[in-house]
Structure formats: C-alpha cells, structure tokens
C-alpha cells in the first residue's frame, strides 16, 4: 500500500534521495573470496578445508558475524566493523570458545582480506568454530578453535524489488526459542536452524520472509532481521527480553531516529500491536532496511514519505559516507 498521507516532518534528517543514497553498481551475483583470512594469515581460499569430523559440522558449534563493505567516494569502507567483532567475541565467550585475537586484530584482518580480494561492495563473514575432535558435546575440552574471515559479493538480500517497494512476509507457525533455553543474544550457527524452518515455510507459502513469535505470542524477529513498526509517528521495536539478536543495524536505526527527533518505544509487543501498525520494516546487515508491504494479506504503508523510507535513506547515506556525521562508523580499506 503506497503512501497517500502527507509526510511528517523530522527536521534533523539528512534526507538524501534514495537514488543518490543507494550504492552504485550493486553486484548481481555472489562471487566468492579468492583469498581468506585464516587464523591470522591471508591464504588462498581454495587451499583451505574443514575436517568432516569438525565439531561445528555435527553440533552447530560456531559463531559468526556479517559485515557490509560499501563503495564510497574515498574507496570501499567497512561499516561498524569493530562493533561486529566485539559481538563475535561476546558470542564466542558464551559458547566457551577461546579466541586468541582481539577486536583490533580481527578488524584489521577484515580490512586485509577485503583489500586482497579487490572488492568494494561485499559481505564479510567472520566465523569461529570448534574443529576436529572426538564425538562429544564438550568441545572446549578437546577441539581447537579456528577463526576465518571470508568475503563474497552481495547486492540486495531480499531482492531489489523488496528493498524499494516492500517485502511480502508471513507469520511463521514455528516459534522462536526462548532466551532461557539458548543465549539468543549470541550469533551462533546452531541457532539458525530455527530460522531455516521459518524461511522454508515462507518460501513454500510464496512469501519473501517470515516473522517468528515467541512462546507467549509476542513478536521476536524475522528469520535474520529485527522488526520495527510505526504507529502515530512513534517508532517501535522490541528489546532483548523478546529473544532477539540485538542487531547492529537495529542500533544504527535507533540512533539515527533519535538524532532526528523521532519518538521511540523499545519494549515487547504482541502480534496484534504489530498488525495495527501503519508501517513495518525489517533491519539487518544483509537486508539493510527493507520495508514490509504485506503480512499474510494485510497491507501496510510504503512510499518515499514514510518514516521507514526516510530511515532507509538515512541509513544508506550513512553506510556509503554521503552523510559525514557518522564517518566514525566507517573503516576505509
């Protein structure tokens, strides 16, 4: 449902037109790394392998991040790379992984592998995993931890049409696991089996993505994104008690909205509250800021004058360096 209401005014937005904010020449494919950062060294990606008895392959004992590289007027830049690496180390601690690298070393590794692969618009995947060892669910006793940082080209995640016009989303029949069962704040590979079930269900129903509810019926997240909605000019999202991964894109949007003077509510919300919203959008490193135009046949506002669209433009202007107020979030290659 396109926007037919008069635009609300937020005078502090650096409101750059979408065509200007969008990075130019987004890659259409997902070409892989020629080089990879592997335990502190740049190596040829084709030479690296994982043992078929690696603990992570059997039990999902890996933690990871996703970081975007964007083209800017000063060359390619990584967005909030240090924040991503801090979260990686936090996830590793929750799973008992000992990683011998700090935030600075890992961030520099991401810069090095980006430079070595000669890319300017990509997705970076740092991943730490428990490797070869006995068949055991106590991997920290006997399995070495390997850390690698790989890259691949990535344009839009849910598609150019969804980014511009909105995604079609369904409410999954699968529920999100509770934060008392698993550390939902950790970005761990095993956790995403839950998301795979929901994503496959959405695919089978003909939708772009799915939103998962918690056991109590409150909203958790989409398959890999945080959920925002707008009602009466107020921006709403849920908090950590809703079993979410507190996204770095989510944090960026909240900070940009606060700077613009937008009223914000951060608390658990129900499916009913979300479905009464005027507009809904999803945020994530891969998905960026993607509007939702429909949930199970119910339409929501989209269009250039919605708050979500303004935040989308502000976000894209920030990650590409066009809005200089947050150059401190960019690490140039």
Model-found features: residue ranges?
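Helix-start/capping segments and mature chain N-termini
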Residues: 1-101, 108-112, 135-333
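Short, acidic/charged, Gly/Pro-enriched secondary-structure junctions
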Residues: 107-121, 125-134, 152
């Amino acid at each position: 449902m396109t926007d037919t209401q008069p635009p609300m005014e937020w005078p502090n937005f650096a409101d750059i037109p979408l065509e200007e904010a969008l990075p130019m020449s987004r890659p259409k494919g997902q070409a892989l790394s020629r080089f990879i950062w592997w335990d502190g060294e740049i190596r040829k990606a084709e030479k690296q392998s994982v043992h078929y008895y690696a603990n992570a392959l059997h039990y999902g004992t890996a933690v990871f991040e996703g970081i975007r590289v964007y083209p800017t007027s000063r060359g390619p830049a990584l967005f909030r790379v240090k924040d991503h690496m801090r979260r990686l180390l936090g996830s590793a601690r929750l799973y008992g992984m000992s990683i011998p690298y700090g935030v600075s070393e890992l961030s520099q590794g991401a810069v090095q592998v980006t430079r070595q692969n000669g890319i300017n618009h990509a997705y970076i995947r740092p991943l730490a995993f428990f490797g070869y060892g006995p068949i055991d669910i106590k991997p920290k006793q006997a399995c070495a931890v390997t850390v690698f940082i790989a890259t691949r080209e990535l344009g839009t995640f849910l598609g150019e049409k969804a980014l511009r016009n909105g995604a079609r989303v369904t409410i999954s029949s699968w529920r999100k696991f509770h934060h008392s069962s698993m550390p939902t704040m950790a970005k761990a590979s095993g956790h995403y089996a839950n998301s795979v079930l929901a994503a496959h269900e959405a695919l089978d129903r003909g939708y772009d993505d799915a939103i998962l509810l918690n056991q109590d019926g409150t909203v958790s997240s989409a398959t890999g994104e945080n959920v925002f909605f707008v009602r009466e000019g107020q921006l709403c999202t849920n908090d950590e008690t809703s079993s979410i991964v507190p996204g770095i894109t989510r944090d960026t949007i909240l900070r940009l909205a606060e700077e613009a003077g937008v009223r914000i509510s951060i608390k658990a919300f129900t499916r009913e509250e979300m479905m009464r919203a005027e507009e809904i959008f999803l945020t994530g490193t891969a998905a960026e800021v993607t509007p939702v135009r429909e949930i199970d046949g119910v339409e929501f506002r989209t269009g250039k004058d919605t708050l979500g669209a303004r935040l989308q433009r502000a976000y894209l202007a920030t990650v590409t360096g066009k809005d200089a107020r947050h150059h401190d979030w960019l690490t140039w290659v």
